[in-house]
């Protein structure tokens, strides 16, 4: 079962890469042929893949861990990497997940609306000239509170930026609401069953 295998790999990555401040970033790319590609180098704040390993390949999964103390959401650098891979044709929007594993839980992004996502990637790749970077900075400067609040604030950033992305989130046992524990939640901030009513603002 692919879902069980993914969950097991995420759990292993979490215990290996998220419970120490001295751990380095780690993760993998899974290709459409089922091949797993692992980083050629990594530090506590960065990891890179060999261009020859990914050349001409389509990705179905791209998962990486932020070591202890790292954020529970993708950094702007992560969003640039995601946008670059899409721009270079590595991503089939209908069959792709991008995930960040942290000590707080796992956040997975899926592409819900490709035309909107395509425009978002162009804005992200515009860097300082784009709105996405400014809106991410606004989010980052104000983010705080509980795990749920920060997840909510990140989703508000995605919505404000018209990203075309949807979020799935699974908190670690030690964080988040008890009823969430160990369960994947699809978070649609436009619905009344969202994290909390503030997410709809």
Language-model-derived ranges and their functions:
Residues 35-48:
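N-terminal carbohydrate-binding/catalytic regions of secreted carbohydrate-active enzymes
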Residues 1-5:
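Non-catalytic propeptide/linker segments at domain boundaries
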Residues 46-61, 65-201:
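Active-site-proximal loop/helix of nucleotide/amide-processing enzymes and allied scaffolds
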């Amino acid at each position: 079962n692919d879902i069980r295998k993914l969950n097991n790999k995420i759990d292993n990555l979490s215990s290996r890469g998220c419970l120490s401040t001295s751990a380095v970033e780690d993760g993998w790319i899974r290709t459409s042929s089922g091949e797993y590609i692992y980083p050629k180098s990594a530090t506590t704040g960065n990891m890179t893949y060999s261009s020859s390993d990914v050349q001409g390949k389509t990705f179905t999964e791209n998962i990486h861990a932020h070591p202890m103390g790292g954020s529970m959401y993708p950094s702007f650098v992560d969003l640039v990497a995601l946008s670059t891979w899409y721009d270079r044709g590595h991503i089939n929007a209908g069959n792709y997940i991008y995930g960040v594993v942290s000590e707080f839980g796992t956040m997975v992004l899926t592409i819900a609306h490709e035309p909107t996502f395509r425009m978002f990637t162009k804005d992200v790749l515009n860097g300082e000239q784009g709105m996405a970077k400014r809106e991410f900075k606004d989010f980052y400067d104000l983010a705080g509170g509980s795990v749920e609040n920060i997840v909510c604030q990140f989703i508000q950033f995605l919505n404000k930026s018209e990203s075309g992305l949807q979020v799935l989130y699974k908190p670690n046992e030690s964080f988040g609401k008890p009823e969430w524990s160990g369960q994947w939640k699809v978070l649609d901030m436009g619905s009344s069953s969202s994290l909390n009513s503030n997410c709809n603002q």
